[in-house]
């Protein structure tokens, strides 16, 4: 199957700020061999990787963007907060989540596993939409560094062509 990309833009919902300029980018069928996922994203400048699942509550990172790649099985992930989109996510799919965009696992197969990584290996923060974290988080979202490359292709496109500032 051929790789396809879809974009989703989420406005601030009052709790989850989302990103004011950049949409979520979903890559269906991003990788044929998920065993190479960590090596690929690292080669493309995305590191500080981990593998596991996605938290079952809304959260976001204000200081960095994030790539998630489904390594095993499938899940439904909600992006953008309570009023966001529930997106099916299966082995081989990837998503680049802009700083500030909320994400939460709604359901999954028991052994669903993702790889997460960050441009330049940034140490990510964890925000859950509490009122006392909002003001600083909104500032940090706007300051999150643009990645040098798309984590899947290693080129500007498609990510950086979509994220035109």
Curated annotation (Swiss-Prot):
It comes from the Bacteria. SMART domains: Cupin_1 (SM00835). Residues 28-139 form the Cupin type-1 domain. InterPro entries: Cupin_1, RmlC-like_jellyroll, RmlC_Cupin_sf, UCP019307_cupin, YjiB-like. Transmembrane segments: none annotated. This is Uncharacterized protein YjlB. It comes from Bacillus subtilis (strain 168). The gene is yjlB.
């Amino acid at each position: 199957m051929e790789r396809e990309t879809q974009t989703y833009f989420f406005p601030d919902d009052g709790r989850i700020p989302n990103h004011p300029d950049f949409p979520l980018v979903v890559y269906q069928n991003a990788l044929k061999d998920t065993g190479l996922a960590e090596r690929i994203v690292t080669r493309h400048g995305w590191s500080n990787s981990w593998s596991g699942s996605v938290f079952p509550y809304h959260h976001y990172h204000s200081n960095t963007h994030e790539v998630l790649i489904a390594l095993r099985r499938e899940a439904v992930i909600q992006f953008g907060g309570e009023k966001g989109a529930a997106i099916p996510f299966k082995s081989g799919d990837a998503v680049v989540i802009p700083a500030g965009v909320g994400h939460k696992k709604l359901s999954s197969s028991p052994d669903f596993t993702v790889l997460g990584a960050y441009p330049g290996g940034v140490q990510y923060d964890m925000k859950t939409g509490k009122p006392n974290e909002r003001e600083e988080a909104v500032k940090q979202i706007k300051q999150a560094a643009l990645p040098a490359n798309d984590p899947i292709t290693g080129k500007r496109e498609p990510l950086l062509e979509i994220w035109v500032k």
